[in-house]
Amino acid sequence: MEPQRKHSTALHTCHPCRRTIPYRIYAVFHTCGIIALMYHHVHSIVNANNTLITCLLLLSDIVLAFMWATTTSLRLNPIHRTEYPEKYAAKPEDFPKLDVFICTADPYKEPPMMVVNTALSVMAYEYPSHKISVYVSDDGGSSLTLFALMEAAKFSKHWLPFCKNNNVQDRSPEVYFSSKSHSSSDEAENLKMMYEDMKSRVEHVVESGKVETAFIACDQFSCVFDLWTDKFTRHDHPTIIMVLQHNETEMMPNLIYVSREKSKVSPHHFKAGALNTLLRVSAVMTNSPIILTLDCDMYSNNPTTPLHALCYLSDPKINFDLGFVQFPQKFQGVNKNDIYASELKRPFDINTVGFDGLMGPVHMGTGCFFNRRAFYGPPTTLILPEIETFGPNRIADKPIKAQDILALAHDVAGCNYECNTNWGSKIGFRYGSLVEDYFTGFMLHCEGWRSIFCSPTKAAFYGDSPKCLTDVIGQQIRWSVGLLEVAFSRYNPLTYGIKPLSLLMSLGYCHYAFWPFWCIPLVVYGILPQVALIHGVSVFPKASDPWFWLYIILFLGGYAQDLSDFLLEGGTYRKWWNDQRMWMVRGLSSFFFGFTEFTLKTLNLSTQGYNVTSKSNDDNEQMKRYEQEIFDFGPSSSMFLPITTVAIMNLLAFMRGLYGIFTWGEGPVLELMLASFAVVNCLPIYEAMVLRIDDGKLPKRICFLAGLLSFVLTGSGYFFLK
């Protein structure tokens, strides 16, 4: 895998961020402030008239202090890296083989044309075509997706040569033909017509819900559609593996469709199970040393992305224990100020450079180049699979369409194949959490593998972001449940991870494992001081009390550092403001309900299902609201009841506080400041409650229930504030 070098031997460099020293100094002062705050809380409990209120505030501040510590662990040694792919020089036959795994599960939430564009964009990489094998896992077992990929295989014979001969940069056909800068040559226009014809056929099939005989009568794969009988369902069906295109001429990549066997009586382990099936099938067919995992909506935006990854994976100084190279998730179509914080800048950019200065970033689930060897035990101890001849170091030299190869591939994709094996525990992607990406990355790090964050100037991948608040919240409820599954298991990062990793790396992983815990201080600080303010009671120090300034300093210091993080990593003030607002929204919705769902699941009172986030944006009115930066609350949903209740409570407290200024004298100033800050953040909610009449407004039922709950909370304050 080691290349020849042009000029300098360095394929990559790294340098520490300039903010490191100031952040370390600030961490010392902020820690002193937190210690002082804890002392104040303990002193208050001893002398408190109402122990319950003081204990709730103490609990909230303990959670805030812990989460600040986890964030600070990622601020102490952030680094930035630069790759030089132009220095990577190797003959085509010397490039390492590359297997690409693309996962999809529902042709209606993840349109087949989206899958097609993702597959074509990576098949067209600036990389020796015969070295690329693209495996598409269809966990929904849909004939619609298979038909779309059959069409893609035909179109690729024209699209790939066009891209490479004309140095096309946008290698997703949909993106290229939608751009104003695409070529107007006859060849390009003919290709566009071919693409539109393919697109219309695929969309017609999806709309009708079945593959009509007229579309496949002359196709060599037409007989495979006979498998879709009345007994065939997405949860119960046989294995289907189709080699739609293979590189026998060394001019085109392999394209393989894989739908693993499903049975209602056998656990399938969601996406982790699908990826492990692809690991085994690819080991049988191609066994490439490098694996790229992609979600079906993350198309390639940079044709040289594999070369950026090879700058690290081919470096003999670091590749012995280099498990994976993680690229950031970037999203297309995000509105100017990112009202839903869809870019997830803190987890995908800011925190990641902090992880990179330790043992490397967490696995983000997509856009990741793996060393295949990393899935088979620690760097120093190879754990062979049950079929030893198909270990990570074997050279696959048989034709992938050979009958014995296809038969074995079908066998390893069976629903009972993993029984009594190490798959999911010691080999492959790990089971036990809905967030298989986070958990797998954590286990690889604990085994001694390192990772690297690679963020080229030209984004490697672009995906689709939710355009409706319901989709944003729903997606993160699932994340919250999965993260808590790790936090409350034997693999808790703080107990299990501290020995093989380090204190800072363990705290970094804790930042995500305990992510849903943000809901505790947000609920307490969103309701308790406001109820107190309405009743004219102080729960914080008054303005004349020296402790008053400790709260002010900690609040302003924390927010100033958060803003600094954002601006230094290329963000804007408006995006930061929307990000911190969405932190509150998530805390009072997705984190709150995720915490609740996990608790019910632990008590066997609820079963969490895996729901695919819709990536289809066909609602024109919804898109229009998104582009105008108007919050879209979508259909009626109880997910918005807590945040609406908190919004009403803060508005009532704010109005009561303004009136009280003239009657209370010194009064509860901190409570009024907190309510004022919350009211400013809740302006889109008030607008959706009262001023709007479109379909994206808050439903009247939610507003009524929130008002009723606010009345109950305010009334109850009369009793517990005594």
From Swiss-Prot:
Tissue specificity note: Expressed in young seedlings, primarily in the vascular tissue.
A Gene Ontology biological process term: cell wall organization
Enzyme class (EC, first level): transferase
EC numbers on record: 2.4.1.-
Record carries keyword Cell wall biogenesis/degradation: yes
Subcellular location: Golgi apparatus membrane
Any one Pfam family match given in the protein's UniProt record, by short name: Cellulose_synt
Record Gene3D superfamilies: Spore Coat Polysaccharide Biosynthesis Protein SpsA, Chain A
Membrane spanning stretches: 25-45, 51-71, 514-534, 548-568, 583-605, 635-655, 660-680, 702-722
Membrane association type: Multi-pass membrane protein
A molecular function GO annotation: cellulose synthase (UDP-forming) activity
GO cellular component, as recorded: Golgi membrane
Family assignment from sequence similarity: Belongs to the glycosyltransferase 2 family. Plant cellulose synthase-like G subfamily.
Name by which UniProt lists this protein: Cellulose synthase-like protein G2
Organism: Arabidopsis thaliana (Mouse-ear cress)
Phylogenetic lineage: Eukaryota, Viridiplantae, Streptophyta, Embryophyta, Tracheophyta
Name of the gene encoding the protein in the UniProt record: CSLG2
